[in-house]
Regions:
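Short glycine/proline- and acidic residue-enriched helix-loop micro-motifs
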Residues: 100-120
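Active-site metal-binding loops of divalent metal-dependent hydrolases
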Residues: 14, 138, 145, 194
């Protein structure tokens, strides 16, 4: 097959204060830190030269600012479906605080009281996937970590929560969804690639978690 298959580039927003503190950041609209802004600019270098039929960003400022600093603010369209998981009562809490009360809790299985279930966030991801598949060209998205994991699962037609606990998505990282050979074979081509991130904030964990599927 000689026809080029569409590619979806998915960028996670840069660091916020709660990225470093480990607090669940769903609808709380936090700005980027100085490192977050720096790394968003490094993402711009990584994406330079690529052309997209559409660019979409979450309305949350951490994603929208990353989009702007990456060089796509003027052309990006806001898509409310790209917002992060609604953590409800668990917003602002650290994972350790939650499991101290509920040791068996698993976000990707149980969701959050007062927030979204895996099924509900999966429905949002489905709407995004449906729109992407109608566009027929390369697309760039700016979103948040847990939503990106659910989006990848739904791109592959897997249950919303089945991949998330096994995948990492670092700040300012780039992942790539596409197809293999034909449009009925969706694949993950690249995952959690943050090689472009500034060296002074690049962590060993980031390098260890990077996974490329060729």
């Amino acid at each position: 097959m000689n026809e080029k298959l569409p590619i979806v580039y998915v960028a996670r927003h840069g660091d916020t204060a709660w990225t470093h503190s480990g607090q669940h950041t769903g609808f709380s609209d936090l700005p980027l830190t100085a490192d977050g802004e720096l790394n968003a600019r490094m993402l711009r270098k990584r994406l330079q030269g690529l052309n997209f039929v559409k660019v979409f960003t979450s309305p949350l400022q951490r994603a929208a600012r990353t989009c702007e600093l990456a060089g796509f603010g003027a052309e990006a369209e806001v898509d409310p479906d790209l917002v992060e998981w609604n953590y409800g009562e668990y917003e602002k809490l650290r994972n350790a605080e939650i499991v101290a009360k509920y040791p068996e809790w698993d976000l990707f299985r149980d969701g959050c009281p007062g927030g979204e279930s895996p099924l509900q966030i999966g429905e949002r991801a489905d709407r995004v996937v449906q729109r992407l598949r109608k566009l027929g060209g390369d697309v760039l998205l700016f979103s948040s970590g847990h939503f990106i994991r659910v989006l990848a699962a739904r791109w592959l037609d897997l249950a919303p929560g089945c991949l998330g606990r096994y995948l990492s998505v670092n700040p300012s990282s780039l992942s790539v969804l596409s197809y293999e050979h034909t449009l009925d074979r969706p694949v993950i081509r690249l995952w959690n690639d943050d090689r472009h991130v500034a060296a002074q904030t690049q962590t060993n964990v980031g390098r260890q978690n990077q996974c490329s599927v060729l």
